[in-house]
């Protein structure tokens, strides 16, 4: 049976992650408060950030930047701004 969480990003109850995907206290906070759907949305933004900003995950500063963006996106409701990206126009 799926584990439900009260997702702070979606502001509703939704299926939670199957296991802790991120280390440490932040990982526990994500596991307890973020749904699979919200995590999937973050992964899309994360991929775009890494590619567009040419982040190197071996670089501590780049990892710290990405972690702060993740916190802003998942817990503070801030949208990730990616230079040059224009979302598709819906008809």
Swiss-Prot record:
A cellular component annotation (GO) from this entry: cytosol
Keywords for the protein's UniProt record, in alphabetical order: Iron
Organism superkingdom: Bacteria
Gene Ontology MF annotations: iron ion binding
Any Gene Ontology biological process: cellular response to oxidative stress
Pfam family, one: Iron_traffic
Keyword Chaperone: no
Entry keyword Transmembrane: no
InterPro entries linked to this entry: Fe_traffick_prot_YggX (IPR007457), Fe_traffick_prot_YggX_sf (IPR036766)
Function (record text): Could be a mediator in iron transactions between iron acquisition and iron-requiring processes, such as synthesis and/or repair of Fe-S clusters in biosynthetic enzymes.
Protein family per UniProt: Belongs to the Fe(2+)-trafficking protein family.
Official protein name in the record: Probable Fe(2+)-trafficking protein
Species of the source: Shewanella denitrificans (strain OS217 / ATCC BAA-1090 / DSM 15013)
């Amino acid at each position: 049976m799926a584990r439900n969480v009260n997702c702070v990003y979606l502001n509703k109850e939704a299926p939670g992650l199957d296991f802790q995907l991120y280390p440490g206290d932040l990982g526990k906070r994500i596991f307890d408060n973020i749904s699979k759907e919200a995590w999937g949305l973050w992964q899309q933004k994360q991929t775009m950030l890494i590619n567009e900003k040419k982040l190197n995950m071996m670089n501590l500063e780049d990892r710290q930047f990405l972690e702060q963006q993740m916190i802003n996106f998942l817990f503070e409701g801030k949208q990730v701004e990616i230079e040059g990206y224009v979302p598709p126009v819906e008809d």
